[in-house]
């Protein structure tokens, strides 16, 4: 299950580097959880052709990630954001000054709006 989620993230990140047909088949397989025979029927092709396309795209997506590391960086940034928010929550509990609590709330809001 973990690999399917990872591949779905790779597809969302690098899908624009694939052809429209490749993206369509990969989304049907990874996001919509259709079987290869079901996808083959929808695309008027063979199960083997779909299998080959999925394997080829899988390899391409992993290759893009190995070179660019965008998903890895995204996950690392999300972990850092969570860690900062956890620390702010602890700090907020310890502070009694209303102005400082408000400042912490603003910092947390800024962290939530940050994305790469």
From Swiss-Prot:
Superkingdom as given in the UniProt entry: Bacteria
Function: Might take part in the signal recognition particle (SRP) pathway. This is inferred from the conservation of its genetic proximity to ftsY/ffh. May be a regulatory protein.
Name of the protein described by the UniProt record: UPF0122 protein CA_C1753
Pfam families recorded: UPF0122
Matching HAMAP family: UPF0122 (MF_00245)
Family annotation (Gene3D superfamilies): Winged helix-like DNA-binding domain superfamily/Winged helix DNA-binding domain
Cited InterPro entries: RNA_pol_sigma_r3/r4-like (IPR013324), UPF0122 (IPR007394), UPF0122_fam_protein (IPR054831), WH-like_DNA-bd_sf (IPR036388)
High-level lineage: Bacteria, Bacillati, Bacillota, Clostridia, Eubacteriales
Organism of provenance: Clostridium acetobutylicum (strain ATCC 824 / DSM 792 / JCM 1419 / IAM 19013 / LMG 5710 / NBRC 13948 / NRRL B-527 / VKM B-1787 / 2291 / W)
Family label: Belongs to the UPF0122 family.
